Amino acid sequence: MSPDRFPGWPHWLPIAAQRPRMSPDWWPWVASRDSLTARLRIASPRPFSVRLLTQGVTRPRLDEAQALGLPHRTHVWHREVLLRLGNASWVAARSVAPLEGLSGARLCTLGERSLGSWLFRQPNLERGPIEAIRAPAMTGLDAWRGDAGPWGRRSLLRVGRTRILVQEFFLAAMAADLSLPSR
C-alpha cells in the first residue's frame, strides 16, 4: 500500500525532490550527511543535552517497516528523544531498528546521550539516502506535536549488521533561535 492512499501516513520524498520547496537556509540542516549532534553544538553556545522520551520494543509504523524492509507486525527497538540547546528543544528524533543485529550495538545503554555520539564514531558507518517530509506533525510523535517545525528528515544507517532508521524533526524553537524561515 502506498502512503498516498492514507493521508495520515507520513509521505517521505527523496531530499532532492523537496529542495524546490525548501528555503536555502534549511537545506544545509536537512540535507547534511554528517552528525546533526555536532552541527547543533556548533550552532549555539548553549549547553547541548538529550531528553529521553521513550525507549523499548514496539511495532514499527507502516512507513518505518517498509523503509527497513520488515513485515509490519515485526517487533523493533525504538527510541524517541528531544535534542536540546539550553532549555529549548530543537530536534525531536525517533530511531527504529530491527531486533536482530542489535547485540553488541550498545543502543539500549545510550540513556541521555545522543545516538549520533555513538554512530559517528563507528569506522564502518554507512548512511543511506536522505528523505525529507514537509509536514512532520503527521508522524505521530505526540510529545512535541505542538512545536513542530517545517521539516523532518530520515535515513537508514548501518553499522555492521545493525540497521537503524533515524528520523529527525526540526522544531519551531530551532527555527526561531536561528532565525530560519518557515519553509
From Swiss-Prot:
Protein name, per record: Probable chorismate pyruvate-lyase
Cellular component GO terms, alphabetical: cytosol
Subcellular location field: Cytoplasm
Entry function: Removes the pyruvyl group from chorismate, with concomitant aromatization of the ring, to provide 4-hydroxybenzoate (4HB) for the ubiquinone pathway.
The reaction(s) this protein catalyses: chorismate = 4-hydroxybenzoate + pyruvate
EC number: 4.1.3.40
Main location: cytoplasm
MF annotations from Gene Ontology: chorismate lyase activity
Pathway note: Cofactor biosynthesis; ubiquinone biosynthesis
GO biological process: pyruvate biosynthetic process; ubiquinone biosynthetic process
Entry keyword annotation includes Lyase: yes
Positions that bind substrate: 79, 115, 168
InterPro entries with a match to the protein in the record: Chorismate--pyruvate_lyase, Chorismate_lyase_/UTRA_dom_sf
Keyword vocabulary terms for this entry: Cytoplasm, Lyase, Pyruvate, Ubiquinone biosynthesis
Pfam family, one: Chor_lyase
Family: Belongs to the UbiC family.
Enzyme class: lyase
Entry superkingdom: Bacteria
Annotated PANTHER family: CHORISMATE PYRUVATE-LYASE (PTHR38683:SF1)
Presence of keyword Cytoplasm: yes
